[in-house]
Amino acid sequence: MRLVLTGAEGTMARTLLSVVPAHHDVVPLSRAELDIGDHHRVMRTLVPLHPDAVVNLAAMTRVDDCEDERDEAYRSNTLGPHHLALAARACGAALLHVSTDYVFDGMKESPYDELDRPNPISVYGRSKLGGEEMVRRHTPEHFVVRTGWIFGGGPDHLSRQVALMRSGEPGAGLFDRVGSPTYVRHVAERLLPLLLTERFGTYHLAGPEVESWFDVLTRIRFLAGLPVMVERQLVQDLDLRAPRPVNSALTSLFAADLGLELPPLDVALKEFLDGQD
């Protein structure tokens, strides 16, 4: 299978490249190589490559920056997937588009499944939902894959907190928001198997537990035997410009039907911690 991978400089893309079997032909394209917001460039680049599938990992993901840079957020997160969908259809390729839990408003008391109605509350969430809608509208051979709170694969908030705790300083995690902490490698390992099913549609690939970042750091404290405390943070105490859903946890009903559900959080955290050593 020939795969074209957009957003190749990102964490998910780098992780996916590390797990795809060598007999597949993968063409990674960074933003410098392919600006998905440029329709003509997308067509000129993708169609001659004759891909079997396009995996879109290119996005503007800085939630607060999206509030300040709305035009760029919609260009990257809505128009970009639109252009990719048109190009994928033109060359007969499937399109796997990675989206987010932030398409939901957080008012549900239990995890969101694939049939729940999105209602985003931030520019980031609205722009990502727009991208989903463009993909569904313009190419029938599509996968929309929503993920949870991604960690691992490189420097991120969680790895910085763990480094702080290992140095003897207390960690700090947001307490009044919950989601689905999701190890990036566990998602990356399931993208190609999902593509190969050709069972197109919308899927949730997210960790199975509902936790806050405070809960996650507390688990890490015990798993790693760290003799430090974890401090609770509240949204109101942080300089966050974009609203966050109170609950953005996902449940993976359709992925479970395919045997692609993710491992428990403790398994993910042990793998994550092993990679930090």
Region locations from a protein language model:
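NAD(P)-dependent short-chain dehydrogenase/reductase
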Residues: 133-179, 185-186
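C-terminal amphipathic/interface module of NAD(P)-dependent oxidoreductases
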Residues: 243-277
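N-terminal Rossmann NAD(P)H-binding glycine-rich loop of SDR-like oxidoreductase domains
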Residues: 1-22
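Adenosine-cofactor binding site in Rossmann-like domains, unifying the SAM/SAH pocket
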Residues: 23-44
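Mid/C-terminal beta-alpha module of Rossmann-like enzyme folds, strongest
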Residues: 15, 190-191, 197-241, 273, ...
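NAD(P)H-binding glycine-rich loop region in Rossmannoid oxidoreductase-like domains
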Residues: 39-76, 89
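Catalytic helix-loop patch of NAD(P)-dependent Rossmann-fold dehydrogenases
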Residues: 75, 79-83, 103-145, 150
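Glycine-rich Rossmann NAD(P)(H)-binding loop
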Residues: 173-178, 203-210, 257
